[in-house]
Design a protein with these regions (language model features):
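Active-site and adjacent substrate-binding regions of carbohydrate-active enzymes
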Residues: 1-674
């Protein structure tokens, strides 16, 4: 690929030369299929995909990968811990945007070895407004089922089998795969109804809370028990057991699956399970009970109902807005969600205080076991810990020793406990990617967030570079801070390019310039991990707001109500048409393929280190430097060639990559040292 953009369209190039690009991948000349647009990739015929993978992987490996009863080993199996994540370049995929797990495999054909890990956004059955982060069960979301794959391989006739073989294929392609771990559910999920004691309840009359006693779950269990008595069990089982046998996790007579079948019905009966869940929810609501909505940021606790603000649903239920008694800057209440009750309360919750010395151990055991079962069943290599910034202890982060997990930290944070549980079961490489934003102390969680990240043993964290314009003071300060943390703390901040949360019309201004620089630095600053959301490589600049269907954030939920004009979507996700950016992304990928063995994972030596005001940055590898990388974060000043050559010194360097033909702003270059 030369430095100038093609005269014919990328679609024409693909039609004319697709067999050449496929052969480069099939014969291991490249680790991805060059010049394959994502929108073309996800439309590839299933048999075409099988043919490509058969020639790439071999018949035996492909057959094994397509058997859900067999497992392709993780490419990370030789690792003894999760530290590999600290230098991983990750791609985040909302499956709803590409419709099926098998389409993740198709999209992965466009992703080279230089982006080695794939984070799959939540895979569970969604709840209110179809929110992926408001799961109603640990069942896999049936909307991610591929009819095309099932027709080609009739034995792959469930979404669970398709997820397993998709991860098998991704492993065979050299990718690690991560799942979202969510410490909350929909407010009336199957989990809430099956295990009322695992959640926090309130009783209200109209728009007023009349009780928030810790023991309210017993009254809710009674309501559910009476419903089953009136309507029978969902699977026809006779009620030959006690109420406590049904609800108590300490009585091991019923398995989780049996309990859920008794209350809701068989997993495959989606409509029947939904009907039972809504009927039970209605009984509970009619008697004045509901789960406490989830909160974020200090003070976390102390809520009241705004009796004037509510939503009326189709059944006539009023869903009131909850508010903080004493809100702070980032205090949020998430009305559709409820968090697991991880700790007992003090004084029967009279003052909304949790007793952090008294964990509800059955809840911790349950969520650790359920996420481990998912890891084992499908073969996930790492977890993204949703809302990892939550730290509700008003006294801040306790002082811990690294070796004291079993004695002091086992019940500190659920995400930490899940990671350690999975590792202890024989998956030592299982890693933890934390959703935190590296903000100042006491802002999104009590105490120092950096200390919290170390206490929960997160290998890497998302950070917040995606939330500012490249080259601004805010962006530069974040980058300088993050790189310092990379070298001085036990976790690695990501150079985050874009996330599904930020692919949102409210944040278009962040991505109207310098997208090529974001990708360049994320790729070639090889001692810092990076994160890129699906579709960035073709994302439109959105100088004016695009259609809702162009934003992947609006597919995190599923809203068909036309009255919600900013969120409603009609039909599938629409890929961007920024083919000029894609061409330059491909050029960077092609060059990275060629030089990767000389730079991957190596420490950086700054030749010109960035600061708040020094926006031109120049670096090479600390060991055996063969290439020099230049990136100009400034939008005001062009690149200073004299300064570059002064910085390079007396080395003989040859320019091999330059983005000037693409844009005279935010120029990026690579020099080869000879």
């Amino acid at each position: 690929m030369n430095g100038v953009e093609p005269q014919q369209s990328l679609f024409d190039l693909w039609r004319q030369y697709h067999y050449v690009y496929k052969e480069q991948y099939q014969s291991h000349q490249t680790s991805y299929i060059p010049n394959l647009l994502p929108e073309i990739a996800v439309q590839l015929n299933v048999y075409d995909v099988f043919g490509i993978l058969q020639r790439r992987l071999g018949t035996e490996t492909l057959q094994k990968a397509l058997d859900p009863n067999q497992t392709i080993d993780s490419p990370l199996k030789h690792h003894t811990d999760g530290s590999w994540l600290k230098k991983s370049n990750m791609v985040g995929i909302n499956v709803r945007t590409i419709q099926s797990f098998f389409n993740v495999v198709k999209y992965a054909l466009t992703i080279p070895k230089t982006q080695d890990s794939i984070h799959i956004l939540p895979i569970w059955e969604p709840g209110v407004v179809g929110s992926l982060y408001g799961k109603v069960s640990f069942n896999i979301n049936p909307e991610f089922y591929s009819e095309e794959l099932a027709r080609a391989v009739p034995s792959l006739n469930t979404v669970e089998k398709q997820l397993k073989v998709s991860i098998n294929l991704l492993h065979a392609m050299g990718k690690s795969v991560g799942m979202d771990v969510i410490p909350h559910t929909d407010r009336f999920s199957e989990l809430v109804i099956a295990y009322p004691r695992f959640f926090e309840w309130v009783r209200r009359v109209g728009g007023r809370i009349t009780s928030n006693s810790e023991s309210l779950y017993r009254e809710v269990e009674e309501i559910i028990w009476h419903y089953i008595g009136r309507n029978g069990t969902a699977n026809g089982t006779s009620l030959s057991f006690s109420k406590n046998t049904l609800f108590s996790p300490e009585i091991p007579i019923l398995t989780d699956a049996q309990r859920l079948e008794i209350i809701f019905g068989h997993v495959s009966d989606v409509k029947g399970r939904l009907r039972r869940r809504i009927e039970i929810m209605q009984d509970i609501i009619n008697q004045g009970y509901e789960t406490l909505p989830m909160t974020m940021a200090p003070p976390y606790r102390g809520l009241h109902i705004n009796s004037e603000d509510y939503i009326l649903d189709e059944n006539g239920n009023r869903w009131y807005t909850y508010e903080f008694d004493e809100p702070q800057a980032m205090s949020r209440v998430f009305g559709p969600l409820t968090r697991y009750k991880l700790f007992h309360s003090k004084d029967d919750n009279a003052n909304w205080q949790l007793d952090f010395d008294n964990p509800q151990k059955c809840v911790w055991d349950y969520i650790c076991r359920k996420y481990y079962e998912c890891q084992q069943r499908f073969g996930f290599d790492f977890m993204r810990g949703d809302m990892a910034h939550i730290q509700p202890r008003p006294d801040g982060v306790p002082t811990f020793q690294v070796s004291d997990f079993e004695t002091n930290r086992k019940y500190y944070d659920p995400l930490l406990s899940i990671k350690k549980f999975v590792q202890k079961q024989g998956v030592p490489y299982f890693a933890f990617f934390a959703e935190t934003f590296l903000v100042e102390p006491d802002f999104m969680g009590y105490g120092d967030e950096l200390a919290h990240l170390e206490a929960i043993e997160a290998e890497a964290t998302l950070g917040d570079l995606q939330s500012s314009v490249v080259g601004t003071g805010e962006f530069m300060q974040k980058f300088v801070d993050y790189y310092r943390y990379l070298k001085t703390r036990q976790f690695a901040p990501n150079y985050t390019i874009i996330t599904a949360d930020k692919d949102d019309p409210r944040f278009d201004e962040f991505y109207r310039t310098a997208n090529h620089l974001r990708f360049f630095v994320g790729l070639f600053l090889t001692d810092m991990p990076s994160y890129m959301g699906l579709g960035f490589e073709v994302r439109n600049l959105h100088i004016e707001r695009g259609a809702n269907e162009e934003y992947s954030k609006l597919y995190v939920f599923s809203i068909q109500d036309n009255a919600q004009t900013d969120k409603v979507t009609h039909g599938p996700f629409v890929w961007g048409q920024n083919y000029s950016l894609f061409w330059w992304v491909e050029k960077m990928r092609e060059l990275a393929e060629r030089i990767w063995d000389d730079v991957v994972g190596k420490s950086t030596e700054w030749l010109l280190e960035p600061t708040l005001n020094q926006k031109l940055m120049i670096w090479t590898t600390a060991e055996n430097p063969k290439y020099i990388f230049v990136a100009n974060n400034s939008s005001e000043y062009g690149i200073n060639d004299e300064l570059i050559w002064q910085t390079i010194g007396n080395q003989t360097a040859h320019l091999i990559f330059d983005t000037t033909p693409y844009s005279d702003q935010h120029i990026c270059r690579i020099y080869e040292v000879r």
